[in-house]
Amino acid sequence: RKAGAIFIAKTNTPEFGLGSQTYNPVFGATGCAYDPSLTAGGSSGGAAASLALHLVPVADGSDMMGSLRNPGAYNNVIGFRPSIGRVPGEPGDEQFYSRLGVSGPMGRNVEDTIKLLCTMAGSAPFDPRSGFEDKLDVDAFRPKRFDEVKIGWLGDYGGYLETEPGILSRCEAGLAKMASNGGVVEPVSAEFDMTRLWKTWLDLRNWSRVAFWPFYDDPKKRALMKPELNWEIEQSRSITGADLYRAANTRSDWFRALNKLFDKYEFLALPTAQVFSFSKETHWPKSINDKAMDTYHRWMEVVIGPTLAGLPTANVPVGFDDRGRAMGMQIFGRFGEDRAVLELASAYEGIVDWLSIRPKLPS
């Protein structure tokens, strides 16, 4: 508001912001801007769809498990998850141990996303992780020169992640475009036990549901809550202090593993999603390539790596499949290198035309 923003509305989100499919019993499901029969993704599905449809110029949201990145990919817009602390948290948040979610911007292009980030970023006395030394200035951003860029492509973590056919190839085509413009792109291995990282994710995410115990303990309220939230709350009941200690150490080990890669590569890349947008009547994919998903959010495992490391991550578009479904790619850099990530995203935007393909509205 101090920067002159006009707040228009709160767009649709899933119940308690859980899941990358925007549906709830109040407003129903939000359709993708390009095909309203498909999901807009989530949890900022309403924000991404409204952006793509030109209902708003920019939108903000939060991102724990891809809530800015996933709907950005499905609606062919930019979604940016900043470094932890770049945008101050809420005054009542737990500020030290369990920080997974952050607030960030979305835009129809990188320039607008940068402008909103510079408005949102800053320091706050209630957030000890805020107040980066490099104060973001809109006028200081410049598109990266590709001949100065080296990117490590993590892909599906060496076959660990199931991905719908067509996703990896579209990401690789986008990377090839950067390489043809002078960038260096190489496949890399994280050299990490990804099953260990998933266990860490479950423990830390489920533990955060302790805050919902009072709702769960009220039978009338519990009966109204979505089953996925009740499941997470039930899982949180059995998490021990030792589990959290191990999870914290695994998270630190993962951060160090990525920093080793950053010694060689300025940026790393992953797909933004493991499946293309699906029917908005389906709450979540039960399988990918006939492999069963054992939790309601396993199909979004690809986004937890940047989250657990707290790294700045941009979703950029990589095009559409033969059914017209959009997909995106995550580009992320070292902690605190938000500007560099967005400068690479800006350079990439300049060599592809995916963002110019807007939804066709009924006449």
Residue positions per predicted region:
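Short, surface-exposed loop/helix-turn segments at secondary-structure junctions
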Residues: S130, K199, R246, F278-M300
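Acyltransferase
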Residues: T163-A190, W213-K220, L244-Y265
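Short glycine/serine-rich loop segments
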Residues: K2-S123, T307-G328
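A short helix-breaking turn/cap at a secondary-structure junction
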Residues: I78-A173, S346, I351-S363
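A short, well-structured catalytic beta-strand-centered motif of the EAL phosphodiesterase domain
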Residues: M329-F335
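Charged, often glycine-rich, active-site loop that binds/positions anionic groups
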Residues: N24, G28, L197-F212
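Short helix-loop capping/hinge segments that flank enzyme active sites or metal/cofactor-binding pockets
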Residues: R1, P143-G155, L204-N259, P271-F276, ...
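Short, solvent-exposed turn/loop segments enriched in Gly/Ser/Thr/Pro and often Arg
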Residues: T11-G19, F192-M194, T272-Q274
